[in-house]
A protein has these predicted regions:
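Amphipathic, Lys/Arg-enriched alpha-helical "gate/interface" segment within cytosolic domains
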Residues: 1-142
Length: 142
């Protein structure tokens, strides 16, 4: 399955990584949800998610849309094994919508946490930190 450039799947880690650039809007979210649902159907095994929103320039969403997507994800994933969804965010608007998503998926197999620190997200997901960093970040750190 060919993924859009902002998405990468690490089969060895059972992890889908989303790195949006530019604007996060309804079209961007819909594209990610479509890929997510396709992978869930194709793989038939649970995988965690990591959303690195630090590269996004702007968030153009609204409460109604976030509620709709969160509730749809909650219902569509009902009865599946638990998965973790880590959201790395610094933007106040993104954090606000991520918290709403976490609240609405509470009690479902989708466990959402929001992080400001990449290492904490890596620890929670139980994956090596370097797998969550971009090539540019690795170059700057090295």
């Amino acid at each position: 399955m060919k993924l859009p450039p902002e998405l990468e799947f690490h089969d060895d880690l059972h992890l889908l990584i989303y790195r949006p650039r530019g604007v996060i809007d309804e079209a961007a979210v819909k594209k990610v949800v479509d890929v997510l649902e396709d992978l869930e159907a194709k793989l038939q095994k649970p995988f965690d998610r990591f959303s690195d929103t630090l590269g996004a320039d702007e968030v153009e969403l609204n409460f109604k849309y976030v509620i709709q997507v969160s509730l749809c994800r909650r219902l569509s994933y009902l009865g599946h094994p638990p998965v973790k969804s880590a959201i790395l965010a610094a933007d106040a608007t993104m954090i606000h919508y991520a918290r709403l998503h976490a609240l609405l998926t509470q009690g479902s197999p989708i466990h959402v946490r929001i992080f400001k620190d990449r290492k904490e997200a890596a620890d929670w997901l139980a994956v090596p930190l370097e797998r969550l960093t971009t090539d540019r970040e690795q170059t700057e750190a090295g």
